[in-house]
Amino acid sequence: MAAAEMERTMSFDAAEKLKAADGGGGEVDDELEEGEIVEESNDTASYLGKEITVKHPLEHSWTFWFDNSTTKSRQTAWGSSLRNLYTFSTVEDFWGAYNNIHHPSKLIMGADFHCFKHKIEPQWEDPVCANGGTWKMSFSKGKSDTSWLYTLLAMIGHQFDHGDEICGAVVSVRAKGEKIALWTKNAANETAQVSIGKQWKQFLDYSDSVGFIFHDDAKRLDRSAKNRYTV
């Protein structure tokens, strides 16, 4: 599914739902007498009332986190600067949060903004993440906003064939540009990881090569860690 299509998928086709609520019709068999008023059916009126209050649940609950790497040297332990911001579990709550937070181009230098499945912390030490790894994409400064949104939509909309492998994503703002990383939980599962990498590129219409680094390699070798998979 193309990136723009995913955004449309997260909206609601009210016309189709109204048609279903009205019994699938749409045509009036009998002509109206002059001055006659068509009364709204009880089914349609009931549907319209529900549409205002009913929320559309996601496959998983997700949590937004914020971190500022420039403060880490002053912390007693790595990760203590992480802040849990907001947890959402419906389409409506996602948009409510997304529309009221800074997008990557507006974040301060050194900021890391995360969106992870609920109860998974964006740290290597988290039990779900411990044996995983990351796919990474690079962007020029101020150019990652749309790709970040489409990454979020692909994750929370369960667009990946191996969506259960995904832990979350993070956008990092640095002096040289911005990076988006997609975290997965089982780095050794090459078939799943390669599938995720290929689909991610497709969703974002991203043409450059992207690489996958194991968390174990990153912990041991830091910036010297090499890509295990490339797509």
Swiss-Prot record:
Listed result of changing residue 109 to I: In strain: PI 247087, allele pot-1
Top-level lineage group: Eukaryota
GO MF annotation list: RNA 7-methylguanosine cap binding; RNA binding; translation initiation factor activity
Region feature (EIF4G-binding): 56-59, 66-102, 150-159
Disulfide bonds, paired cysteine numbers: 129-167
Record GO biological process: defense response to virus; regulation of translation; translational initiation
Keywords: Cytoplasm, Disulfide bond, Host-virus interaction, Initiation factor, Nucleus, Plant defense, Protein biosynthesis, RNA-binding, Translation regulation
GO CC term (a single one): nucleus
Effect caused by changing residue 77 to D: In strain: PI 247087, allele pot-1
Annotated positions binding mRNA: 74-79, 106, 124-125, 174-179, 219-223
Reported modifications of this chain: According to the redox status, the Cys-129-Cys-167 disulfide bridge may have a role in regulating protein function by affecting its ability to bind capped mRNA.
Pfam families: IF4E
Location in or out of the cell: Nucleus; Cytoplasm
Stretches of the chain forming a coiled coil according to its record: none
Transmembrane segments: none
InterPro entries noted in UniProt: TIF_eIF4e-like, TIF_eIF_4E
Misc: Displayed sequence is cv. PI 134417 and confers susceptibility to potyviruses (e.g. potato virus Y (PVY) and tobacco etch virus (TEV)).
Family: Belongs to the eukaryotic initiation factor 4E family.
Role description: Component of the protein complex eIF4F, which is involved in the recognition of the mRNA cap, ATP-dependent unwinding of 5'-terminal secondary structure and recruitment of mRNA to the ribosome. Recognizes and binds the 7-methylguanosine-containing mRNA cap during an early step in the initiation of protein synthesis and facilitates ribosome binding by inducing the unwinding of the mRNAs secondary structures. Key component of recessive resistance to potyviruses. (Microbial infection) Susceptibility host factor required for viral infection (e.g. pepper mottle virus (PepMoV), potato virus Y (PVY) and tobacco etch virus (TEV)) by recruiting viral RNAs to the host ribosomal complex via an interaction with viral genome-linked protein (VPg).
Assembly and interaction partners: EIF4F is a multi-subunit complex, the composition of which varies with external and internal environmental conditions. It is composed of at least EIF4A, EIF4E and EIF4G. EIF4E is also known to interact with other partners. In higher plants two isoforms of EIF4F have been identified, named isoform EIF4F and isoform EIF(iso)4F. Isoform EIF4F has subunits p220 and p26, whereas isoform EIF(iso)4F has subunits p82 and p28. (Microbial infection) Interacts with potyvirus viral genome-linked protein (VPg); this interaction is possible in susceptible hosts but impaired in resistant plants.
Name of the protein: Eukaryotic translation initiation factor 4E-1
